[in-house]
Amino acid sequence: MADGAGAGAAGQASGPSGGSSGAGGPVNPASLPPGDPQLIALIVEQLKSRGLFDSFRRDCLADVDTKPAYQNLRQKVDNFVSTHLDKQEWNPAMNKNQLRNGLRQSVVQSGMLEAGVDRIISQVVDPKLNHIFRPQIERAIHEFLAAQKKEAVPAPPPEPESQDPPAPSQDAS
């Protein structure tokens, strides 16, 4: 039973707003152990808020259509669709939605998308992983955790001697 309760609490904290930990206050990410679901959720939310995932997506999409794996997959899908449609006998009463859904299912069941996407990932994403994405993610995580540590440590109270004495011009009035 305790495992189920723990999973539920972790699930609540993984929401976009960070959720509540049940302990009452906000969770200090720097105090969570590596791999903790709450820490992971907080980091992912931070990366999203910085726009890193959008940046990575744009970077990959800008590069994808130049890669042979994409061009090969596109050609395979085009040929598959042409062959599939050639086998259909056109009828004006034909339900186009059913035809479209049947074609979609055939493409998915063929397995060509899964294999083609895997090849695209290895040509587009994998080369960027260690040299582009990882350093940006690590930098963002370090900055996030450092900022959280600063918030968790209360600032020292101002020194009483640093207060300015009243200006003499006010006393002369």
From Swiss-Prot:
- Its recorded name reads Biorientation of chromosomes in cell division protein 1
Q: Where in the cell?
A: Cytoplasm, Cytoskeleton, Microtubule organizing center, Centrosome; Chromosome, Centromere, Kinetochore
Per UniProt, the ranges with Pro residues bias are 154-173
Span list, region Disordered? 1-35, 148-173
Family, as annotated: Belongs to the BOD1 family.
Instruction: Return the Gly residues bias intervals.
Output: 16-25
Classify the main location: cytoplasm
Q: Which Pfam families match?
A: COMPASS-Shg1
Give a yes or no for keyword Cell division in this entry. Answer: yes
What is the scientific name of the source organism? Answer: Mus musculus
Q: Which gene encodes it?
A: Bod1
GO cellular component terms, alphabetically, are:
centrosome; cytoplasm; kinetochore
PANTHER family hit by this protein: BIORIENTATION OF CHROMOSOMES IN CELL DIVISION 1 LIKE 1
Q: What does this protein do?
A: Required for proper chromosome biorientation through the detection or correction of syntelic attachments in mitotic spindles.
Keywords associated with the record: Cell cycle, Cell division, Centromere, Chromosome, Cytoplasm, Cytoskeleton, Kinetochore, Mitosis
- Biological process (GO), any one: cell division
Subunit-level organization: Component of the SET1B complex composed of the catalytic subunit SETD1B, WDR5, WDR82, RBBP5, ASH2L/ASH2, CXXC1/CFP1, HCFC1, DPY30 homotrimer and BOD1.
